[in-house]
Amino acid sequence: MRECISVHVGQAGVQMGNTCWELYCLEHGIQPDGQMPSDKTIGGGDDSFTTFFCETGAGKHVPRAIFVDLEPTVIDEVRAGIYRQLFHPEQLITGKEDGANNYARGHYTIGKEIIDQVLDRIRKLADQCTGLQGFLCFHSFGGGTGSGFTSLLMERLSGDYGKKSKLEFSIYPAPQVSTAVVEPYNSILTTHTTLEHSDCAFMVDNEAIYDICRRNLDIERPTYTNLNRLISQIVSSITASLRFDGALNVDLTEFQTNLVPYPRIHFPLATYAPVISAEKAYHEQLSVAEITNSCFEPANQMVKCDPRHGKYMACCLLYRGDVVPKDVNAAIATIKTKRSIQFVDWCPTGFKVGINYQPPTVVAGGDLAKVQRIVCMLSNTTAIAEAWARLDHKFDLMYAKRAFVHWYVGEGMEEGEFSEAREDIAALEKDYEEVGLDSYEDEEEGEE
């Protein structure tokens, strides 16, 4: 089997983990204690869900996941929550003190005390796999643990499991909704460190998700649970093809092959449709064409940026539920006729399509309506450079005055790392700019 190990780091990662595993359990009919009444084969049957769950001799299903945080309170909620029997106690790893929103603490001082314990546990999980496919890492850019510890872990995983894919789901600091003043520092530092260790990173911007909750679900003041439920639907759509059999299945490595044209340009934009509340869904039947169209609306994106100002390099549509290829092809043909969607000229308008017949599941008592079909679009577009530009600008404002830098230096970092990281992200912006240029422009420049 092609197993995936999920690693949830820091508060954001752990809370995303909670909602994701809650949803996976519902989708596979696994109870909170790990029993699965529908599964008649005790012991490792050849089921698709074993990519994410391993089965014990007693017929219990245990997630192939690890939760790590440098302070215990968030993971204690898992230890006391309704899914406490689902996870192996050694898969929930906590430190004694906090990452304190400080990349240097997560990466150097506090992180290095706990990293070996985490890697041991990952090694045990990897040993249970017959054909480990790769790692999914969930974290935020802004927190100390999410930024610092994740980058340390990714470096070490590259060393231990060189050829395995590493995908990230990262919470990008929202332009308006900020949880820490030093988010820009942490984000730039972690991006710089993980850039060469990550194969593909799906960014999720809290503010974009807030807006979707407000606009589409009529939630006036969305809580983190509301946000995470929506994020978990997206993660579930991306991983559905690994967990269920479908007509057109997509493997982890297949994502990279189709979405990443150059190793550094590995930040696809995720869009999910339809996000609709139960009251409205009752009155609307959303066709394949409609949901496909709404994927190209900037309002449904997980990161605030405008693809109409950028160009698409690759596009991957993952459908789920009652969808047939004929409808999909018709929907794509309609989209290609629209001029607002521009592809780079060196990439013919290729859409990769995945179809999974498993209908979408929603959490009971949640905000999302149960619908017949959904689509999650992953597109690699040059517009995401806007997100880096915003972050760089904030970084520059603070770094010009060397504000807060002493906290990082005090934890054993060197100031040179800041400028090195900042230059790397500037280079990333430049890379995006160059990729978007038309190829004939490059040739003319070369001749002059």
From Swiss-Prot:
The keyword Transmembrane helix does not apply. Pfam families: Tubulin, Tubulin_C. Keywords: Acetylation, Cytoplasm, Cytoskeleton, GTP-binding, Hydrolase, Magnesium, Metal-binding, Microtubule, Nucleotide-binding. It catalyses: GTP + H2O = GDP + phosphate + H(+). The active site is at E254. The modification N6-acetyllysine is found at K40. GTP binds at Q11, E71, S140, G144, T145, T179, N206, N228. Belongs to the tubulin family. It is an enzyme of class 3 (hydrolase). It comes from Gallus gallus (Chicken). The keyword Membrane does not apply. It is found in: Cytoplasm, Cytoskeleton. The lineage of its organism: Eukaryota, Metazoa, Chordata, Craniata, Vertebrata. Dimer of alpha and beta chains. A typical microtubule is a hollow water-filled tube with an outer diameter of 25 nm and an inner diameter of 15 nM. Alpha-beta heterodimers associate head-to-tail to form protofilaments running lengthwise along the microtubule wall with the beta-tubulin subunit facing the microtubule plus end conferring a structural polarity. Microtubules usually have 13 protofilaments but different protofilament numbers can be found in some organisms and specialized cells. This is Tubulin alpha-5 chain.
